[in-house]
UniProtKB/Swiss-Prot annotation:
Keywords from the UniProt entry: Chromosome, Cytoplasm, DNA damage, DNA repair, Hydrolase, Magnesium, Metal-binding, Mitochondrion, Nucleus
Organism: Danio rerio (Zebrafish)
Regulation of activity: The protein undergoes a dramatic conformational switch from closed to open states upon substrate-binding, which enables specific substrate recognition for the 1''-O-linkage. The glutamate flap (Glu-35) blocks substrate entrance to Mg(2+) in the unliganded closed state. In presence of substrate, Glu-35 is ejected from the active site: this closed-to-open transition significantly widens the substrate-binding channel and precisely positions the scissile 1''-O-linkage for cleavage while securing tightly 2'- and 3'-hydroxyls of ADP-ribose.
Source organism phylogeny: Eukaryota, Metazoa, Chordata, Craniata, Vertebrata
Cited InterPro entries: ADP-ribosylglycohydrolase, Ribosyl_crysJ1, Ribosyl_crysJ1_sf
Protein name: ADP-ribosylhydrolase ARH3
Length: 370
């Protein structure tokens, strides 16, 4: 492929970049309505979504949570520092929490963020490593903010590597940071059109996770939690099995994949939501496009709805693009304009000729901050 072709080709991806970040924010904002709910009837979900069409509600009526707040910190750090800078990213996390603590942060991560705020802290990974008696967190907090890594790095290896490092700032258990890698890889593959072949998409993710779960630390953590030796691979195989069935109930999805705050119980679930909603489904309006179906279905699962919808929205948005997202949904959610701006900045740098000629430097893209 010529250099000119490599420069022109990414132009078609602008919509996908924007869709990924905006879809993430929408899932977070819209999903907050049902967070923690055990039973979420589909008609309640559809009623909630139809209310977004009401022009009298005003802009920013649905607030974003810590999911979006921390995702923005990741994006800003990558854009500003040119590479993954753990200290810069950690400081942004701490500053964001201090500025706006009422975003629904969990008690565990709050302890970490307060320690990260200390000017005397030498190792920014240490507070997370000290969590839960040294076992670290296996929650989905690293995965919920992983989208910018999928946009900032070209190679799959770098997406995998740096999304894990970014998650380790708050989640030092391999179940936590490997979940972040899985989410980032799913968005990365979706950006490249891999969802056109759903089974190949899953197979690629399984292959990636097999490499990560061969690690001795991952094996140790899985054993300590009484899980299978390759927990994410096992869940992804369950996703494939569910996809092969002619009929799947919400109860079965929750039983097989989960809907909780653990990364293992939510990242594969988000991936399933996207795959399941590639085609129209009973109970969902025919007028809904794929992204709308994905978010609606994510909410109907209950549990950690804002984060599951956030992750599913990012993967779906990277596939369908910004034009698939209803404008009424966008203006009803806080932080959409900022997410769109971050996506455009990442995209603009992605298209720079000098960047395309220097594909092997393993650095994320950045802006000039002068």
């Amino acid at each position: 492929m010529s250099a000119a072709a490599r420069v022109v080709a990414p132009v078609m991806m602008l919509s996908r970049f924007r869709g990924a970040l905006v879809g993430s924010v929408l899932g977070d904002c819209i999903g907050g309505e049902f967070e923690g709910a055990v039973d979420v009837p589909l008609d309640r979900v559809l009623q909630h979504l139809s209310a977004l069409e009401d022009d009298t509600r005003g802009d920013g009526i649905l607030q974003y949570s810590d999911d979006t707040a921390m995702m923005r910190c990741v994006a800003d750090s990558l854009l500003t520092r040119m590479t993954f800078d753990e200290r810069d990213m950690a400081q942004r996390f701490a500053k964001e929490y201090s500025h706006s603590p009422g975003r629904g942060y969990g008690s565990g991560v709050v302890q970490v963020l307060r320690k990260l705020a200390s000017p005397h802290l030498k190792d920014v990974f240490q507070p997370a490593q000290a969590q839960f008696g040294g076992r670290g967190s296996f929650g989905n907090g690293g995965a919920m903010r992983a989208v910018p890594f999928a946009l900032a790095f070209r190679s799959r290896a770098d997406v995998r590597k740096y999304s894990r490092f970014g998650a380790m700032l708050t989640h030092s258990c391999s179940l936590g940071y490997n979940g972040a890698a899985l989410q980032a890889l799913a968005v990365h593959l979706s950006l490249q059109g891999a969802l056109a072949l759903p089974k190949d998409f899953i197979d690629k993710l399984i292959s990636e996770m097999e490499e990560l779960e061969k690690d001795e630390t991952a094996k140790h953590d899985a054993k300590a939690l009484n899980l299978s030796e390759f927990p994410y691979c096992s869940r992804l195989h369950r996703v494939k099995e569910l996809m092969d069935k002619t009929s799947v109930s919400i109860e079965e999805v929750i039983s097989e994949l989960g809907n909780g705050i653990a990364a293992l119980q939510s990242v594969p679930t988000a991936i399933f939501c996207v795959l399941y909603c590639l085609e129209p489904q009973d109970g969902l309006p025919e007028r809904f496009g794929g992204l709308e179906r994905t978010i609606a279905y994510s909410l109907a699962l209950g549990g950690d709805t804002d984060t599951i919808a956030c992750m599913a929205g990012a993967i779906a948005g990277a596939h369908y693009g910004i034009d698939s997202i209803p404008l009424s949904w966008q203006v009803s959610c806080e932080g959409v304009d900022e997410a769109d701006d971050l996506a455009r900045r990442l995209y603009d740098l992605y298209c720079l000729p000098q960047h395309n000629e220097d594909r092997g430097n393993n650095q994320p893209h950045t802006t000039n901050t002068d």
